[in-house]
Structure formats: structure tokens, C-alpha cells
A protein has these predicted regions:
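Short hydrophobic alpha-helices and adjacent helix-cap/hinge residues
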Residues: 1-295
Length: 295
């Protein structure tokens, strides 16, 4: 049995599609020769320690966990293999000793998507060079919240922009954060990488549309749902790598000996239909660098 521990919402397809593909590539198919025990925190990260403890008590063969969930799993067991996926630095987060030789019972995939915040600021500036203030939506309970906030603010200040921090760790707080946008008079919104936001693309896109705020997201899935643009790695690709590592561990390999995989592939996705609705025109230079343009 595999434990799948996640801070986001139940059954978010891009997570599971890639993960199942990775498992299948190693010869494992859910419901045939492997079972999964899913635990979704629905953005309530304070539930993760109990969920992790429950999976550990069930003696699952391996635990799959994203950043906040991996921290809970790490506290729950020092023996069950844990395969993480994180947008941050796994060494700085305390998950591993080194990238090549993780050492303990954790290994996984690092996308470094948290480090792309400054690039998102630059992309917004390229699209909207006249704006003087932007908003940053983050989850204050995230381990990466402080570092992400700092790097985004530094990048914005370099471009002469101020940054208003909007905090949300529940659905209600997401709605409240968007409601504040009009009073803040910001020209654009940046949504950070976080399981709470990653598993709610439709909700975030609908709110951005309602408030007519140009928004840049960390994942392609938000743009497919109608968001303006995204810059980041592929969730499906990351979880495919995770699934492959889980399969290898089930075959007997040790997480301590499996180097952390770093996904450096990033993609810029633009939605021209949404841009037209907002009355925006993307510069040719920006369109030319896009990996995908949705019309």
C-alpha cells in the first residue's frame, strides 16, 4: 500500500495522472498490483500531522508527499520511505542531507518553482510596464511563504513597484483576499505555488475574472482554466517522476541512495482570450517566448 499525503484538494487530476503514469512505467497499476491510501488536507495544513501518523500506523510501503505534507511525514516516521515533491530547496527545508546522497528515508523531486517568483514579476512588468503596485497571494502556513515573499518583494522593488501581501489558508480567506484588491489599487496579482492554490484553479480564475485583475500563476492548469498567464514547471511531469521513484522503491531501492531529481524545465503559457477580455495586448517579444498560447 502507498500512502498519498497532500495538502491540497481530493483527487486533483494533474497530480494523479502523472503519478499513475510514473507508477505504470515501473510496472505498477493502482487497483491491480498496488493500492493507494489517499489523505487530502484540503488546505488545512494543521491536519497533516495526524494524517501522516495514521499512514505510518498503517505501515504503508512508501509515502508520497508535497512540501507541507512531507514535513509532517518526516516527523511521523524515520523508517518508512518518503518521496516528496517540492517547489523549494529540499536541503534548506531539512528534508535531505545532499541532493546526490539524500541519506535518510526521504528523496524526491525538486522543481525549484518557488525560485521563479522574481521571473513572474519581470513578466508582469513586461506586460504592464506602467503599474506601480502588485499584490502577492500566499498561504502563511506554507514553509516557503517567507522566502517567496522576500524574493518577490526584492524583484518588484528593483522595478520600482510596491507589493501588497494577501494571505489565505482557507477558501473563505481566498475570497476575502480577492475582495481587498479594489481597495489596494494594484495593477496585477501574483499567485504563489501552494497546494491550496494549485488544486483550486477554477476558483482562483473565476475570482480574478470577477475582479478584472491581471494574474500570473505558477502552473499551466490555471491558464487552461481561463487564467491570463503562468510561468513554472509541469505538475504532471513532476508527479510522473515521483511515481517512477515510488515504483523503484517498491522494487527494493532505498531512498537514501536515490538522488533528488531536479526539474529545471519551465514553461510560459499565455491565454489570449483572457487578455482580450481584460483589454490587454501581449508584446510580440513576450508572445514569441511563450511555450504555449491558448487562443
Amino acid at each position: 500500500m502507498i500512502g498519498f499525503l497532500n495538502g491540497g484538494s481530493h483527487g486533483y487530476a494533474p497530480y494523479l495522472t502523472g503519478f499513475r503514469e510514473g507508477l505504470k512505467n515501473e510496472g505498477y497499476i493502482e487497483g491491480q498490483n498496488v493500492t493507494l491510501a489517499y489523505r487530502w488536507a484540503e488546505g488545512q495544513y494543521d491536519r497533516l500531522p495526524d494524517m501522516a501518523a495514521d499512514l505510518a500506523s498503517r505501515r504503508v510501503a512508501v509515502i508520497v508527499a508535497n512540501t507541507p505534507a512531507a514535513r509532517a511525514a518526516q516527523s511521523a516516521t524515520q523508517t518508512i520511505p518518503i518521496v516528496f515533491v517540492t517547489g523549494g530547496d529540499p536541503i534548506a527545508l531539512g528534508f535531505i542531507a545532499s541532493l546526490n546522497r539524500p541519506g535518510g528515508n526521504l528523496t524526491g523531486v525538486a522543481s525549484l518553482v518557488d525560485e521563479t517568483g522574481p521571473k513572474r514579476v519581470e513578466l508582469v512588468h513586461e506586460l504592464l510596464p506602467a503599474i506601480s503596485a502588485i499584490a502577492l497571494l500566499l498561504n502563511p502556513t506554507s514553509p516557503a511563504a517567507e522566502s517567496t515573499s522576500r524574493t518577490v518583494q526584492e524583484a518588484a522593488h528593483t522595478l520600482g513597484q510596491s507589493v501588497h501581501i494577501l494571505k489565505a489558508s482557507t477558501d473563505a480567506e481566498i475570497n476575502t483576499a480577492f475582495a481587498r484588491l479594489s481597495e489596494l489599487r494594484v495593477g496585477a496579482l501574483l499567485v504563489v505555488n501552494d497546494p491550496l492554490f494549485n488544486t483550486r484553479p477554477e476558483q482562483l480564475v473565476a475570482l480574478a475574472s470577477r475582479h478584472a485583475i491581471p494574474t500570473i500563476y505558477p502552473w499551466r492548469e490555471h491558464v487552461v482554466a481561463g487564467g491570463l498567464m503562468s510561468y513554472g514547471t509541469s505538475i504532471t511531469h513532476l508527479y510522473r517522476l515521483v511515481g517512477s521513484y515510488v515504483g523503484r522503491i517498491l522494487k527494493g531501492e532505498k531512498p537514501a541512495d536515490l538522488p533528488v531529481q531536479q526539474s529545471t524545465r519551465v514553461e510560459l503559457v499565455i491565454n489570449l482570450k483572457t487578455a482580450k477580455t481584460l483589454g490587454l495586448t501581449f508584446p510580440i517579444t513576450l508572445l514569441g517566448r511563450a511555450d504555449e498560447v491558448i487562443e
